Design a protein with these regions (language model features):
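Short, well-ordered loop/turn and helix-capping segments at boundaries between secondary-structure elements
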Residues: 39, 55-59, 79-83, 117, ...
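Acyltransferase
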Residues: 4, 131-210
Length: 210
């Protein structure tokens, strides 16, 4: 199965890293991703996607997959993940360390099982100086959800991808996630108003039409 010529590949989080890794492998998508990574296509793995990008995924108690096993990862990052029954749930702030996004401020959360040991360069640093995630060449991995909510990483990533294609980043119209959400809620509200008899709604509520 081919993926065409994407500007970037994002492997998202998953409810079951092991099962979805096996599906990637069996479907042929793993081979396609590896081929594109070798050609220099940027790969970003988030949470379970980050775990998949590593060398091995060890499930010693069967807490993730239902049986004891060690799986080969995609091998694109120098990391090893060991699953456990404990789940990490935490709100975090971090600063991206990885070029070309260095300096982007992040505010998000982690929610995952497993501990990942990384030997490569970190994707980001916590305020206390702790390392988060891993980077190797054009492959990036992080446990942080909400990467694109603050907008700074979104702008940095979009600008970098534009420059790789010879496009002026100033031509890319970007809006903060919160503003985008408000716009979508306004569109939804307008759609609801257009589909309802608002006079009847206000009358039923004992309110005057605004």
């Amino acid at each position: 199965r081919g993926l065409g010529a994407p500007d970037c590949i994002i492997l998202p989080g998953t409810k079951n890293t092991v099962d979805d890794l096996l599906w990637l492998r069996q479907s042929g998508l793993e081979a396609a991703i590896l081929k594109l990574a070798e050609r220099g296509t940027p790969i970003l793995g988030v949470c379970g996607g980050y775990q998949m990008l590593g060398q091995t995924l060890d499930d010693p108690t069967g807490s993730e997959s239902g049986r004891q096993q060690t799986l080969r990862g995609l091998g694109l990052l120098p990391t090893r993940t060991v699953f456990s029954e404990q789940k990490r749930r935490v709100q975090v702030k971090a600063t991206v360390a990885a070029a070309p996004f260095a300096g982007a401020e992040l505010e998000g959360y982690e929610i995952h099982t497993g501990v990942t040991e990384a030997e490569g360069e970190p994707f980001a640093h916590y305020p206390d100086g702790g390392r988060e995630g891993c980077v190797q060449g054009n492959v990036f991995g992080t446990y942080l959800h909400g990467l694109f909510d603050t907008g700074t990483l979104t702008e940095a990533l979009a600008g970098w991808l534009c420059r790789r294609k010879g496009i002026d980043p100033s031509d890319a119209a970007l809006i903060p996630m919160e503003e985008y959400r408000r716009q979508q809620f306004d569109i939804l509200a307008d759609g609801v108003r257009g589909a309802l008899d608002m006079d009847a709604v206000y009358a039923a509520m004992g309110m005057e039409k605004r």
